[in-house]
């Protein structure tokens, strides 16, 4: 199947022009696009073209390209292109409304499932595993973008393509042998030679200079010899599949037929209403940003991440609807946020233990699925009966692999729950920031209102340094009330608050430690009760 079977107005020359144009946007000083977002954006275009069954007109192709690049930035970068920039860079070909509708259509076709492992992901993993030379890695990145000019990459598995690119890159950079015999390597070389000197498509030449490997390439190319080989790639594209999801996309009619029962909350994100839909009461969360016709980052990430989740301690997303910047998310209805449950007091020791274990079970599930929540607070944990559910994934971040460091924002986590590395402005960080926030939450469940007090970062840092010491254990005041009533639990909390994230236990280990702690307490309680009964019987 050809990529353009359903789109007779599109062709491969147009695609080359589009890719070259998108790569040149990478050099615009007014925007910041990561290498990963550039690659993801290009691959997202092809995935969309493959999945879209409605014929795409020639005029819309450029708009699709820039919108896919913008969506890739929203998922992976700290800054986005934005609809205004997309309109500007397209020289007024499209209005904001047209671009907004294109974005809506692309999201609809993908069913909001935009996460996929691209070739760069595997190149990075191979580079880390094999500890390859920086020049080899940079050259492999250039080669990846070079081969994206053609659609042959769609006919071979992503991981296999990454391995072939890395092997060719190691050969090109390090091998003094001037003859290429491997057919795939011959293909890579001919593509490199074609685009590095192309009179019209200048982006690869610019990238090579940007990556500081142009001189290396220029010196190597004239000396390499090879025999022409037939195309080694299949003509058949490997089928592209969507993420599995039990979540439905609401229609406009369904949304209009939802009866609002009461307002549950309002904030900077928008509002949450209790509504009735299909004879079921749900919570309808609405993001309504001012003067924006595009989906905001928080909404995109929230839906993208939640469609992958299915766990009793994670809030369930029933459905969603998006149009012209406004996003509606249908969520499982719960009784109240955790902080209200705690404010009521009178939680039994067993319920406190249950909440702690459930919190850790939910967090373990998130981290196992490569999601960092980044905003765990007692407002973002809900209670339904005696069940605890983690909610609000607007700040969450999907991590393709824990070994790969992404572009992360420091503007995450409510300040009182914010890990010390973020307060100190240290990048990069990882899922261990959730362990710190979780420690603060566990302390709340046990009865400590806030572990660290303060209205801003400076005051919270001062509180942390006063209670925990400026270095681990030095001059620590500690949590005296917690230690008095919950000595064993407090020692675990201290471990979760280690200043060095690498020393903090992961969610799986914290769950294990708390479970063992609670089992030991139960056994001790049973033994004490038995001893008391025996003494009474003797007397």
From Swiss-Prot:
Keywords: ATP-binding, Kinase, Nucleotide-binding, Serine/threonine-protein kinase, Transferase
Record-linked Pfam families: Cyclin_N, Pkinase
Catalytic activity: L-seryl-[protein] + ATP = O-phospho-L-seryl-[protein] + ADP + H(+); L-threonyl-[protein] + ATP = O-phospho-L-threonyl-[protein] + ADP + H(+)
Residues of the Cyclin N-terminal domain: 1-115
Residues covered by the Protein kinase domain: 258-519
Lineage top rank: taxon: Viruses
Enzyme Commission (EC) number: 2.7.11.1
GO MF terms, alphabetically ordered: ATP binding; protein serine kinase activity; protein serine/threonine kinase activity
Signal peptide boundaries: none
Active-site residues annotated for this sequence: 375
SUPFAM superfamilies reported for this sequence: Cyclin-like, Protein kinase-like (PK-like)
PROSITE patterns: PROTEIN_KINASE_ATP (PS00107), PROTEIN_KINASE_DOM (PS50011), PROTEIN_KINASE_TYR (PS00109)
Gene3D superfamilies registered for this protein in UniProt: Cyclin-like, Phosphorylase Kinase, domain 1, Transferase(Phosphotransferase) domain 1
Binding site for ATP: 264-272, 285
Protein family per UniProt: Belongs to the protein kinase superfamily. Ser/Thr protein kinase family.
The protein's name: Putative serine/threonine-protein kinase L670
């Amino acid at each position: 199947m050809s990529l353009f079977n359903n789109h007779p107005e599109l062709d491969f020359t147009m695609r080359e022009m589009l890719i070259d144009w998108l790569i040149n946007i990478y050099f615009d000083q007014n925007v910041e696009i990561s290498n990963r977002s550039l690659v993801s954006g290009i691959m997202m275009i092809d995935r969309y073209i493959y999945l879209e069954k409605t014929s795409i007109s020639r005029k819309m192709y450029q708009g699709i390209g820039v919108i896919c690049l913008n969506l890739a930035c929203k998922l992976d970068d700290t800054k986005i292109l934005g609809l205004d920039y997309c309109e500007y860079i397209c020289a007024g070909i499209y209005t904001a409304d047209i671009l907004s509708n294109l974005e809506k259509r692309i999201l609809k076709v993908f069913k909001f499932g935009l996460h996929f492992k691209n070739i760069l992901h595997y190149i990075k993993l191979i580079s880390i595993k094999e500890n390859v030379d920086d020049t080899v890695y940079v050259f492999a990145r250039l080669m990846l973008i070079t081969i994206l000019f053609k659609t042959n990459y769609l006919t071979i598995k992503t991981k296999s393509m990454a391995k072939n690119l890395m092997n060719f890159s190691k050969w090109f950079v390090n091998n003094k042998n001037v003859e290429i015999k491997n057919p795939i390597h011959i293909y890579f070389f001919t593509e490199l030679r074609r685009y590095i000197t192309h009179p019209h498509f200048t982006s690869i030449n610019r990238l090579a200079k940007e990556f500081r490997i142009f001189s290396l390439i220029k010196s190597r190319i004239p000396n390499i010899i090879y025999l022409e080989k037939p195309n080694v790639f299949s003509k058949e594209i490997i089928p592209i599949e969507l993420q599995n999801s039990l979540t439905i996309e609401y229609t406009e009619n369904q949304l209009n037929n939802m009866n609002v029962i009461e307002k549950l909350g309002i904030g900077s994100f928008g509002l949450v209403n209790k509504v009735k839909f299909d004879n079921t009461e749900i919570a309808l969360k609405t993001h309504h940003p001012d003067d924006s016709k595009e989906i905001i980052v928080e909404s995109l990430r929230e839906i993208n991440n939640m469609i992958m989740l299915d766990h009793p301690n994670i809030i369930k997303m029933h459905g969603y609807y998006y149009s012209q910047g406004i996003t509606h998310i249908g969520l499982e209805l719960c009784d109240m946020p955790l902080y209200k449950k705690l404010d009521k007091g009178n939680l039994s020791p067993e319920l406190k233990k249950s909440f702690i274990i459930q919190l850790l079970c939910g967090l373990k599930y998130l981290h196992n699925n490569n999601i960092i929540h980044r905003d765990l607070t007692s407002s973002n944990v809900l209670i339904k009966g005696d069940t605890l559910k983690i909610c609000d994934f607007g700040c969450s971040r999907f991590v393709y692999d824990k070994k790969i460091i992404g572009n992360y924002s420091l503007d995450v986590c409510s300040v009182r729950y914010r890990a010390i590395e973020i307060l100190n402005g240290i990048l990069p960080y990882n899922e261990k920031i959730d362990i710190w926030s979780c420690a603060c939450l566990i302390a709340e469940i046990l009865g400590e209102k806030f572990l660290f007090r303060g209205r801003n970062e400076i005051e919270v840092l001062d509180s942390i340094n006063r209670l925990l010491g400026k270095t681990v254990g030095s001059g620590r005041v500690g949590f005296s009330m917690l230690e008095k009533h919950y000595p064993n639990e407090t020692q675990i909390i201290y471990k979760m608050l280690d200043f060095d994230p690498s020393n903090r236990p992961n969610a799986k280990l914290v769950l294990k430690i708390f479970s063992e702690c609670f089992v030991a307490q139960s056994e001790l309680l049973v033994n004490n009760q038995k001893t008391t009964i025996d003494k009474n019987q003797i007397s």
